[in-house]
């Protein structure tokens, strides 16, 4: 129940707020998609993972693939393409 509510909040952001701003996410998947995937995979801990991801997404950060890891982590998972 809580997962569905949190995901609905992110989807509302995607639909009504995100279109008001230019594309700016430096990662794939986007931060909002990452948040949804993290919540689906890790429940409430996924919210913390999503917030950590948003804090990593700024002009001075690296770009590239940053998938949701299978384990709880607040750090970016490096992929072979990042090297």
Swiss-Prot record:
* Primary subcellular site in the record, as a coarse category: membrane
Gene Ontology cellular component terms for the protein in this record: plasma membrane
One of the Pfam families matching this protein, by short name: YidD
Keywords in alphabetical order, please. Answer: Cell membrane, Membrane
Q: Where in the cell is it found?
A: Cell membrane
KW Cell membrane (keyword) present: yes
| Highest taxon of the lineage | Bacteria
| Membrane protein topology class | Peripheral membrane protein
What function does the entry list?
A: Could be involved in insertion of integral membrane proteins into the membrane.
Its family remark reads: Belongs to the UPF0161 family.
Name used for this protein in its record: Putative membrane protein insertion efficiency factor
Q: Which organism is it from?
A: Streptococcus thermophilus (strain ATCC BAA-250 / LMG 18311)
């Amino acid at each position: 129940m809580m997962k569905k509510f949190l995901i609905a909040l992110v989807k509302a952001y995607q639909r009504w707020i995100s279109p008001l701003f230019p594309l700016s996410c430096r990662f794939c998947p986007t931060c909002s998609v990452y948040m949804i995937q993290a919540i689906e995979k890790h429940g409430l801990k996924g919210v913390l993972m999503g917030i950590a991801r948003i804090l990593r997404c700024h002009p001075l950060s690296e770009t590239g693939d940053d998938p949701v890891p299978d384990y709880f982590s607040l750090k970016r998972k490096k992929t072979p393409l990042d090297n």
